[in-house]
Regions:
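Functional cation/ligand-contacting sites centered on basic and imidazole/sulfhydryl donors
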Residues: 1-169
């Protein structure tokens, strides 16, 4: 039997090859497709965030080793993707893992939708309030978490935007 790399090269993935022949494996391999998507999506969201802040006049420096963004030499952000997990109970939850070794000022947790194919919402989590290694989010969270939730990144962009001040008379 050929190695899985042959199937991946020919069909895109072993799961896709299974689907083409109508085979349903005993194990759920959807997480492999999700991981593949996340590897493509993460650089896109970092680039979009970096570009948008720069378009507003903000100065963005990205650490190439960690992807930590330093904004206007004032604060740093780390973007993390939180995949949707649905156990047998049917209740969706998300695990947000903080990169405690890098200690960014703000962790931007991008919570993915139920298909793990698009951003659902964003949590702007300051290190001062969330210094632990991670948190668990549900579909509905306590006000302590919900107060950090946003439908888009406009609040972050507002923090990074540079505004010219008129000269005083």
């Amino acid at each position: 039997m050929p190695p899985t790399s042959i199937y991946s090269h020919r069909f895109g993935s072993l799961v896709r090859a299974y689907q083409m022949v109508g085979f349903t494996p005993d194990r759920d391999y959807r997480y492999l497709e999700t991981n593949k998507f996340l590897r493509r999506f993460y650089p896109e969201i970092v680039n979009q965030t970096e570009s948008h802040i720069a378009s507003l006049g903000g100065i963005v420096r990205r650490d190439p080793a960690t992807d930590i963004l330093r904004i206007n030499d004032e604060f740093s952000i780390s973007l993390v993707l939180a995949r949707c997990q649905a156990p047998n109970s049917g209740r969706h939850h998300w695990k947000v893992r903080f990169d405690t070794s890098l200690t960014p000022d703000i962790t931007v947790a991008v919570r993915l939708d139920q298909t793990n194919q698009a951003a659902l919402d964003y949590f702007l989590l300051p290190n001062l309030d969330f210094g632990q290694s991670g948190i668990n989010l549900a579909e509905r969270n306590s006000v302590e978490f919900e107060s950090y939730r946003f439908n888009n990144l406009n609040y972050l962009y507002g923090m990074a935007e540079r505004i010219r001040l008129r000269r005083a008379a």
